[in-house]
């Protein structure tokens, strides 16, 4: 197969391949950029593999940086944008089921490609657009199959995270996992516990945001991979329910929020679950704001205070989550209700703690409680957001 017109993203990198070839070595675009080009998907990273050893690359190009030279990776800066080239290599000894104990540089493209995870990622692309396919990756793209290169068990023992990647690609591309590869995932699912939670989390989040979430979740359920993920040992039914929903999730907050609701987590379980996945504090806060609002939006019981406490972004996320789980929430109506709030954050209240101190009120819990009550009354339209009105109301509250 030959791609007559390469996407524009490749153009700045093509001179690098030409220079390497002119020096007598092989060089190819490899991995996801080749797969996504063939599938007409957006291209993210341009990866280059070469038969030239790192020292030889540094002789060919004048401006280089050793970004991972022990693994054969050198960044070339000669053409402005930095591009990483990695020497063809074989790997051996995966004691942690993630990283090789040793790397050996080789001159053979086949030896390099056969260590890769899936056939659809083991494609190479020449500078002239010719696709090199040594493991029928093109056939598997046509068949919409995710298939391990060689023996699935070997690939998963080399890197147990590949099992999550298989499920993630199923969700992202809408592909099925080849039966032998799926069986290999079932047999080796427990190895996932050897992998850092943060790495599993990245793949799982991408899965939840895929266009075919159902495919990815089905793979996790069929292989029992989910049993080896944080907080999901009792989550089989919740994942099945999630897989049946008309999901249209757009960001991480929505993804984790929808998952939490389908798992039936209550307010006391939510934060520990999210922390177990090693999510950032900011994301945990965002999910914790959105989730309580979802049920209220779905049951039409969300009031002004609920919208105020959630904040604009959480309100928007909650609407998407609700509708992704089969709700009938009108986004425009909810947004209009939010915009109609008299104030949208505490700083907009016409009276603050400093004003009360000037008026002779002693700082303390009573003052804080009074300001909270005033805020609620303004949000709910019971009081005008006016300095004199609020000062008078505060005085009455503090006398009580």
From Swiss-Prot:
GO annotation (BP), single: tRNA 3'-terminal CCA addition
Classification via InterPro entries: Bact_CCA-adding_enz_type3_sf (IPR050264), CCA-adding_enz_C (IPR032810), CCA-adding_enz_firmicutes (IPR023068), NT_sf (IPR043519), PolA_pol_head_dom (IPR002646), PolyA_RNA-bd (IPR032828)
Reactions listed under catalytic activity: a tRNA precursor + 2 CTP + ATP = a tRNA with a 3' CCA end + 3 diphosphate; a tRNA with a 3' CCA end + 2 CTP + ATP = a tRNA with a 3' CCACCA end + 3 diphosphate
Gene3D superfamilies: 1.10.246.80, 1.20.58.560, Beta Polymerase, domain 2, cca-adding enzyme, domain 2
Keywords, alphabetical: ATP-binding, Magnesium, Metal-binding, Nucleotide-binding, Nucleotidyltransferase, RNA repair, RNA-binding, Transferase, tRNA processing
Sequence positions that bind ATP: 32, 35, 116, 159, 162, 165, 168
UniProt-recorded Gene Ontology molecular function terms: ATP binding; CCA tRNA nucleotidyltransferase activity; magnesium ion binding; tRNA binding
Class of the enzyme per the UniProt entry, highest EC level: transferase
Annotated binding of CTP, by residue: 32, 35, 116, 159, 162, 165, 168
Keyword Magnesium: yes
Binding site for Mg(2+): 45, 47
E.C. no: 2.7.7.72
Cofactor annotation: Mg(2+)
Similarity section: Belongs to the tRNA nucleotidyltransferase/poly(A) polymerase family. Bacterial CCA-adding enzyme type 3 subfamily.
Listed PANTHER family: CCA TRNA NUCLEOTIDYLTRANSFERASE 1, MITOCHONDRIAL (PTHR46173:SF1)
Chain's role: Catalyzes the addition and repair of the essential 3'-terminal CCA sequence in tRNAs without using a nucleic acid template. Adds these three nucleotides in the order of C, C, and A to the tRNA nucleotide-73, using CTP and ATP as substrates and producing inorganic pyrophosphate. tRNA 3'-terminal CCA addition is required both for tRNA processing and repair. Also involved in tRNA surveillance by mediating tandem CCA addition to generate a CCACCA at the 3' terminus of unstable tRNAs. While stable tRNAs receive only 3'-terminal CCA, unstable tRNAs are marked with CCACCA and rapidly degraded.
NCBIfam families: PRK13299.1
Assembly behavior: Homodimer.
Other information: A single active site specifically recognizes both ATP and CTP and is responsible for their addition.
The protein's name in its UniProt record: CCA-adding enzyme
């Amino acid at each position: 197969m030959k791609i007559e017109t390469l996407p524009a993203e490749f153009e700045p990198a093509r001179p690098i391949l030409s220079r390497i070839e002119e020096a007598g070595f092989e060089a190819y675009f490899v991995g996801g950029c080749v797969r996504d080009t063939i599938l007409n998907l957006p291209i993210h990273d341009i990866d280059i593999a070469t038969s030239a050893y790192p020292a030889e690359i540094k002789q060919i190009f004048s401006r280089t940086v050793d970004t991972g030279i022990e693994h054969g990776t050198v960044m070339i800066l000669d053409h402005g944008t930095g591009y990483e080239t990695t020497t063809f290599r074989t790997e051996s000894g995966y004691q942690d089921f993630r990283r090789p104990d040793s790397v050996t540089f080789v001159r053979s493209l086949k030896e390099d490609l056969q260590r890769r995870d899936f056939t659809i990622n083991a494609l190479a692309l020449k500078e002239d657009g010719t696709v090199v396919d040594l493991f029928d990756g093109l056939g598997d793209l046509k068949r919409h199959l995710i298939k391990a290169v060689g023996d699935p068990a070997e690939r998963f023992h080399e890197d147990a995270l590949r099992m999550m990647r298989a499920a993630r690609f199923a969700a992202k591309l809408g592909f099925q996992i080849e039966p032998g590869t799926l069986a290999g995932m079932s047999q080796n699912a427990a190895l996932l516990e050897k992998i850092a939670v943060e790495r599993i989390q990245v793949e799982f989040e991408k899965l939840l945001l895929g266009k075919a979430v159902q495919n990815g979740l089905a793979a996790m359920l069929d292989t029992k991979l989910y049993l080896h993920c944080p907080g999901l040992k009792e989550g089989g039914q919740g994942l099945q329910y999630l897989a049946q929903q008309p999901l249209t999730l757009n960001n991480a907050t929505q993804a984790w929020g929808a998952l939490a609701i389908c798992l039936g987590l209550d307010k006391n379980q939510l934060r520990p679950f999210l922390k177990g996945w090693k999510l950032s504090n900011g994301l945990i806060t965002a999910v914790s704001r959105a989730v309580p609002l979802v049920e209220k939006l779905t049951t039409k019981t969300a009031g002004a205070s609920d919208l105020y406490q959630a904040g604009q972004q959480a309100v928007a996320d909650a609407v998407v989550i609700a509708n992704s789980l089969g709700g009938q929430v009108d986004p425009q109506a909810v947004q209009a209700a939010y915009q109609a709030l008299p104030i949208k954050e505490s700083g907009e209240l016409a009276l603050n703690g400093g004003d009360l101190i000037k008026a002779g009120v002693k700082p303390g819990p009573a003052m804080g409680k009074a300001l909270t009550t005033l805020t609620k009354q303004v949000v709910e339209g019971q009081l005008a957001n006016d300095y004199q009105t609020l000062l008078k109301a505060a005085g009455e509250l503090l006398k009580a």
